[in-house]
């Protein structure tokens, strides 16, 4: 039993790691290092993180995940996009790709639009091109049998995807046909060349009025029918032909904002941001683009947040204000900070969280960035701190970030690794970090399933923060406290005699190692079936200026360490 004249030095509630300062100088409630410790489920307690379970076994490394859409969970694995484990799009080239759910005007289904080197869209009906290419063949008109048309006429035609009489998407028009002069005749139509695009159901014919220059809708013809005739009187023609239904350019990033699809990472125009017509993501007029900065600072990504639109370049970021009527205008942020790892960008109630060269930040685009990574600064400046290797920026393209339930999960490459090998977890409530020793190649949040999911290099898609094992494998946890100098400070020598461990190990064995001035002075094997304070002797002559504890556990349950108290006697200087 501890002697009554000994003084206690107790650990307070723990909040997370601090790599910014010397282990003697960090706050009493901060830790020098942690691995696989969960500070979210029970703040202040040392306990293993929650586990992970297998959702899908894949075929290759998962490098993009999107939350479930209807009955599908989408992932990009190498150059293929999968809906669950079914390949739905191939040839997905480039370092980045974006998968964006969008329900276009008149549609009854939501499509997953795939921005990549091969622009596609997928729904339960199958995979088709994103947008419809215009006809390139020139139609031919001629005078036909007796009819009601008199004057000079020409036509143009488009390709369309229709359901019944409703147009879902339509291309730009063909070249203008020849002019034909009629005198109470029918206009015959030929060379209405069929589209080879599987999504096209109809050819839509637009005709002038007599001597007119505008093209008005005349009729729809089933795709594959290459001839026809126009008989309607001029007053029966309806909608004006649209000439700005361009399919989107090849881009590798897309997002929805104000019912439009915005697109960037255009390799031919790296500083462009394109935007579609409202409600019509497959129509991106050639004039609908913004030049952001200059080509030497390419746009990396964009997001919609709290009614605002923001874009990141490598060096800075911009808020895009305005609308179709007033025009869109980019305004550079007061914090000139961009990102080279766009998959770390995450929209959340805490702002838009992202990773930059100098740390993890939250932004609104309209005000100064808020830094979240002060306590782990060392890994951003090429330092190895308390066993944590610095970030390897050569792997920045593979970094991922996701906010879920009050935490930001940041998966990155450390040391010499070129694929992610560790996850840093920021707790917004505690304003501190923990680290998980798991290799994650993609992250996503599924609100409908209340889950954070992840991809791994073997193609597996897993659910994080569930259960107490990693797919039946044990979890190894460790935590190292600060160097406690006790009330007297680091200049007064002390004799440490006992240590008390307040824990509930759930029947498991947790090891608590006590170091005095970096010398191991006691190894405590703590095993309890309920919360208990256990007292342990330290080695005789455990004298020194400061002490620390190292807590370790490997297993498949959830032991908890609440507090450690070292009992000591201050020694009078000679």
Positions of PLM-derived features:
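Surface-exposed loop/turn positions within WD40 beta-propeller blades
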Residues: 78-79, 117-118, 258, 267, ...
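Inter-blade boundary loops/turns of WD-repeat beta-propellers
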Residues: 84-86, 124-125, 162, 208-210, ...
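Hydrophobic core segments of beta-strands in well-ordered, beta-rich domains
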Residues: 113, 255-264, 303-313, 353-355, ...
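Beta-propeller domains
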Residues: 300-318, 339-352, 357-358
């Amino acid at each position: 039993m501890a002697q009554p004249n000994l003084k206690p030095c107790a650990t307070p509630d723990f909040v997370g790691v601090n790599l910014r300062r010397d282990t003697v100088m960090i706050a009493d409630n901060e830790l020098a290092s942690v691995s696989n410790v969960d500070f979210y489920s029970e703040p202040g307690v040392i306990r293993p993180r929650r586990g992970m379970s297998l959702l899908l076994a894949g075929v290759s490394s998962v490098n993009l995940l999107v939350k479930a859409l209807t009955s599908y969970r989408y992932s990009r694995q190498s150059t293929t996009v999968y809906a669950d484990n079914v390949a739905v799009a191939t040839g997905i080239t480039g370092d980045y790709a974006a998968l964006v759910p969008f329900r276009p005007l008149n549609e009854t289904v939501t499509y997953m639009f795939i921005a990549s080197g091969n622009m596609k869209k997928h729904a339960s009906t199958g995979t088709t091109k994103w947008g419809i290419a215009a006809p390139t063949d020139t139609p031919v008109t001629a005078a036909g049998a007796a009819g009601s048309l008199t004057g000079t006429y020409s036509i143009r035609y488009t390709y369309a995807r229709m359901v019944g009489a409703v147009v879902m998407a339509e291309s730009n028009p063909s070249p203008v046909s020849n002019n034909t002069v009629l005198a109470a005749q029918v206009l015959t139509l030929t060379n209405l060349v069929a589209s080879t695009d599987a999504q096209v159901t109809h050819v839509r014919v637009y005709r002038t009025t007599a001597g007119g220059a505008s093209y008005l809708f005349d009729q729809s013809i089933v795709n594959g029918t290459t001839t026809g005739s126009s008989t309607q009187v001029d007053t029966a023609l309806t909608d004006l032909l649209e000439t700005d239904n361009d399919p989107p350019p090849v881009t590798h990033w897309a997002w929805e904002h104000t019912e439009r699809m915005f697109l960037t990472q255009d390799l031919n125009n790296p500083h462009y941001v394109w935007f579609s017509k409202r409600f019509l993501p497959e129509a991106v007029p050639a004039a609908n683009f913004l030049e952001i900065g200059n080509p030497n600072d390419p746009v990396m990504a964009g997001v919609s947040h709290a009614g605002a639109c923001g874009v990141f370049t490598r060096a800075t970021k911009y808020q895009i204000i305005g609308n179709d009527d007033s025009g869109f205008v980019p305004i550079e942020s007061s914090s000139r900070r961009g990102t080279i790892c766009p998959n770390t960008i995450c929209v959340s109630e805490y702002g838009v969280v992202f990773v930059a060269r100098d740390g993890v930040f939250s932004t609104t685009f309209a005000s100064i960035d808020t830094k979240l990574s002060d306590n782990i600064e060392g890994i951003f400046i090429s330092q190895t701190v308390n066993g944590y290797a610095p970030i390897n920026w050569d792997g920045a393209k593979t970094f991922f970030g996701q906010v879920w339930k009050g935490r930001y999960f940041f998966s990155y490459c450390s040391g010499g690794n070129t694929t992610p090998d560790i996850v840093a977890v920021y707790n917004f409530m505690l304003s501190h970090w923990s680290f998980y020793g798991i290799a994650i190649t993609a992250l996503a949040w599924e609100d409908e399933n209340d889950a954070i999911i992840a991809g791994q290099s073997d193609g597996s898609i897993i659910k994080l923060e569930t259960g107490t094992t990693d797919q039946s494998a044990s979890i190894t946890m460790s935590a190292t406290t600060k160097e406690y100098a006790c009330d007297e400070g680091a200049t007064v020598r002390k004799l440490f005699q006992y240590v008390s461990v307040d824990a509930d190990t759930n029947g498991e064995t947790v090891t608590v190692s006590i170091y005095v001035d970096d010398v191991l002075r006691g190894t405590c094997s703590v095993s309890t079936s309920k919360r208990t304070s256990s007292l342990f002797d330290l080695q005789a002559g455990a004298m020194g200026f400061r002490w620390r504890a190292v807590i370790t556990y490997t297993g498949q349950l959830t032991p908890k360490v609440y507090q450690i108290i070292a009992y000591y006697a201050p020694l009078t200087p000679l």
